[in-house]
């Protein structure tokens, strides 16, 4: 019998049933009506939405209508810096950049070195903060300007955040956070207070602009508990409720529901060299048959194949992706050839990304919010 899946902000285990998870969290599926609203205002729909990577939301229709009224809004997401960045981490950031470009929006990006320090018994605070700076390079490398991107490294940029977090904390009871996050008597008080900080960023643009400025938060579905609480207390604090857009997890190269830092071969990291990328891709699990002869005769199953999943991520051309799907199903495309095509796409992306990443080194402070506010 298959183990029941587990999804929390700190752990994802088992084969995730996304529809069941949606019902459990109480978020709404992203329908063609919301997608049509986005297309109306953006002029197009990003492939990550079109292809179903982002599949659920809270009040996405509200933020689109708010935009239609010409009112201000902003973007928010984040990263827990527990180690190097892999491609799965970057999926919400890529969509974030697209929204920023399409709608001319400022981006608030929280890097939670404090949370990772609290959560990992072996993690030193200095190590978490060093990873925060390293991970920030991957965010900047997506092409954000310092005018648009506001980085918040929690231990370095707490000043504008803390007064809001204090007000948030006063509205959250122990019973509420215990029930929401599964905290126990052995949970350290850092983790218990931490949700106040992640929620606070959702209200920060309103404070800074001194007018109602709701945020749209593209993130993985496991972050929903934080923003459910944010929405529950927003009215009482006089802030607009944040809207959210939730993604599925990026399938592991090994075939599991989610990439895992505990198994480096399950993911492609931005710092992986070409040889490592090639090895990981060529060794990846597939939806193909055991032999080339059977593949040609019966075809493969792209829907369970991480290699096809990655083609959907890296190929912007719908016709090209559909051809790979059909050629796999018909047996015209063998797994080895499909993997080589993917390796080429990933190598090109990472080469360009790493060049931009190195150019960003030494410039992180130009993007930090507290540095900008102190000038």
From Swiss-Prot:
Keywords: Aminoacyl-tRNA synthetase, ATP-binding, Cytoplasm, Ligase, Nucleotide-binding, Protein biosynthesis
Keyword Protein biosynthesis: yes
GO annotation terms (biological process): tryptophanyl-tRNA aminoacylation
Motif 'HIGH' region positions after renumbering to this chain: 81-89
Gene3D superfamilies according to UniProt: HUPs (3.40.50.620), Tyrosyl-Transfer RNA Synthetase (1.10.240.10)
Keyword Secreted annotated: no
Principal place of residence: cytoplasm
Catalytic activity: tRNA(Trp) + L-tryptophan + ATP = L-tryptophyl-tRNA(Trp) + AMP + diphosphate + H(+)
Motif 'KMSKS' region, chain ranges: 258-262
Entry's localization field: Cytoplasm
EC code: 6.1.1.2
Pfam families tied to this protein: tRNA-synt_1b (PF00579)
A cellular component term, taken from the record's GO annotations: cytoplasm
The family this protein is said to belong to: Belongs to the class-I aminoacyl-tRNA synthetase family.
PANTHER family found in the cross-reference section: TRYPTOPHAN--TRNA LIGASE, CYTOPLASMIC, TRYPTOPHANYL-TRNA SYNTHETASE
HAMAP family xrefs: Trp_tRNA_synth_A
Protein name from the UniProt record: Tryptophan--tRNA ligase
This protein's encoding gene: trpS
């Amino acid at each position: 019998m298959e183990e029941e899946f587990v999804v929390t902000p700190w752990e994802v285990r088992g084969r995730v049933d996304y529809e069941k998870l949606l019902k459990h969290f109480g978020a709404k599926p992203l329908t063609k009506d919301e997608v049509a609203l986005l297309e109306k205002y953006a002029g197009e729909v990003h492939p990550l939405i079109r292809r179903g990577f982002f599949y659920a939301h809270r009040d996405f229709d509200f933020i689109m209508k708010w935009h239609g009224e010409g009112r201000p809004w902003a973007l928010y997401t984040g990263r827990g810096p527990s180690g190097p960045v892999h491609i799965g981490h970057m999926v919400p950031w890529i969509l974030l950049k697209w929204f920023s470009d399409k709608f001319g929006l400022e981006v608030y990006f929280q890097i939670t070195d404090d949370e990772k320090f609290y959560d990992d018994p072996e993690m030193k605070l200095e190590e978490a903060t060093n990873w925060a700076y390293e991970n920030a390079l991957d965010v900047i490398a997506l092409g954000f300007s310092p005018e648009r991107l506001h980085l918040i490294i929690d231990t370095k940029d707490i000043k504008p955040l803390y007064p809001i977090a204090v007000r948030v904390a006063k509205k959250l009871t122990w019973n509420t956070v215990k029930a929401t996050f599964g905290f126990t008597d052995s949970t350290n008080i850092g983790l218990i207070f931490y949700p106040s900080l992640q929620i606070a960023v959702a209200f920060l643009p309103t404070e800074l602009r001194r007018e109602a400025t709701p945020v749209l938060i593209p993130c993985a579905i496991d972050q929903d508990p934080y923003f459910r609480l944010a929405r529950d207390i927003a009215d009482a604090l006089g802030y607009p409720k944040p809207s959210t857009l939730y993604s599925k997890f990026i399938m592991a190269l090994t075939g599991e529901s989610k990439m895992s830092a505990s198994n480096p071969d399950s993911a492609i990291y931005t710092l992986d060299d070409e040889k490592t990328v090639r090895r990981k891709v060529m060794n990846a699990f597939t939806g193909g048959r055991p032999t080339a002869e059977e593949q040609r005769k019966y075809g493969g199953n792209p829907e369970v194949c991480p290699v096809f999943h990655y083609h959907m991520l890296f190929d912007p051309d719908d016709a090209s992706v559909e051809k790979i799907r059909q050629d796999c199903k018909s047996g015209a495309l063998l797994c080895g050839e499909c993997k080589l095509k993917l390796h080429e796409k990933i190598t090109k992306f990472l080469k360009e990304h790493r060049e931009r990443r190195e150019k960003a080194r030494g410039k992180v402070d130009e993007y930090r919010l507290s540095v900008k506010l102190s000038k």
